[in-house]
Amino acid sequence: MMQFKEYFKTPIYVEDLPQWVDPINKVCDPYIKEAKERNKEKIKKQKGSDFGVVAHSFPIASDPKLKKYIKYIGDRSWEFLDCMGYDLKNHTCVFTECWVQEFPKDGGGHHNSHVHPNNHVSGFFYLHRNEDSPLPVLHDPRPAALICALPEKSGKDVTYASQAIHWRPNPGTLIIQPAYITHQYSVGGPNKPFRFIHFNIQAIEKRFMRSQ
């Protein structure tokens, strides 16, 4: 009898925290407003349309109003790496990047496939999303598997042969994933605001950390 044993699996951490949405949106509203102000000239050149113009904030991880949320995400990220089997007793997790962004109401918002180099964890927390919003897409991180991939029986099913997957998060969904996974966002059409926080975390050796 044939038995399947799974090795080299890729974990994705998912948690629903809808109680975070309203308080975090309240903190993030001014950041998005400021980002849209910076985009005014681009929108003006497009005759008032924000098609393809993403409102992208400056770093927000140090905002005191977000402290408890940032700490929670940092703790879960450490636990995520620990559960993967990494020895982190001499490491601490540090946010290298954290920002909020909102895709344009007129559509065209997207992210091409990419990774964030020199990080160990990437993640998202969704603040506004409806059924027509862009979809987050993750790609198979195994280059050798992609090089010799055979045709899939069905692109509709998630199988061992899948080269990419997507999901439909809700406002309040927290995603934590290994930073080596290539990810993207599909092109969105005209829709209600699609807003999320994107963050990247590096596990740094404690001996390199500045003592307080």
Place the predicted regions along the sequence by residue.
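Non-heme Fe(II)/2-oxoglutarate
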Residues: 1-87
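Short edge beta-strand segments in beta-sheet-rich domains
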Residues: 10, 95, 192-196
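Short conserved micro-motifs at the rims of enzyme active sites and ligand-binding pockets
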Residues: 26, 188, 208-211
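Active-site region of the double-stranded beta-helix
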Residues: 64-97, 104-120, 127-131, 135
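Catalytic core of non-heme Fe(II) oxygenases with the double-stranded beta-helix
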Residues: 101-174, 207-210
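Short beta-strand His + acidic residue motifs that chelate non-heme Fe in jelly-roll/DSBH
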Residues: 111-114, 183-190
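A short hydrophobic beta-strand segment most commonly corresponding to one strand
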Residues: 122-125, 176, 191-207
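Beta-rich strand-turn-strand
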Residues: 170-181, 191
